[in-house]
C-alpha cells in the first residue's frame, strides 16, 4: 500500500473535497464509478468551473484506492472535457460545464431510448408505453 499523508487532505486551501461513494459490489469498474460521481457533481452544480479538485494521490488516499485507478478516472474525465490538469498547479473543473451537462443529458436519453426499444421488442407499442409511463 502507498503512504498517505492525512494532514495534507484537510488543510489544502482552495481544493474542493470530493465526497465519492464507491460500491465494491457493483459490476461498474471503480474508476468508472469515480468518473460518474464527479460528472454528477458537475451536473448538479456541486463542482463549478474553475474549482480545484484533489490530486490523484490525495484522492487515492481519501478513497483508499490505488493511485492508478484515480489516474485512469482523471484521464477519462480529461478526455471528456470535464477536468483539465495544469502541471504544477493542480486539476480543475473546466469552464465548459454546459457541455458536461449536455453530455449527461444525452447519455440518459440514450438509455431511455434503449429501454423503450426493449419494451417495443416485447410487444408494447409507443402508445401503451406512454400510457404506462404517464407521459
Locate each region found by the language model:
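Short, Lys/Arg-rich nucleic-acid/phosphate-binding segment
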Residues: 53, 85-93, 97-98
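Short secondary-structure capping/turn micro-motifs that flank functional sites
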Residues: 58, 93-94, 135
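Terminal helix-turn-helix DNA-binding modules in bacterial transcription factors
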Residues: 98-105
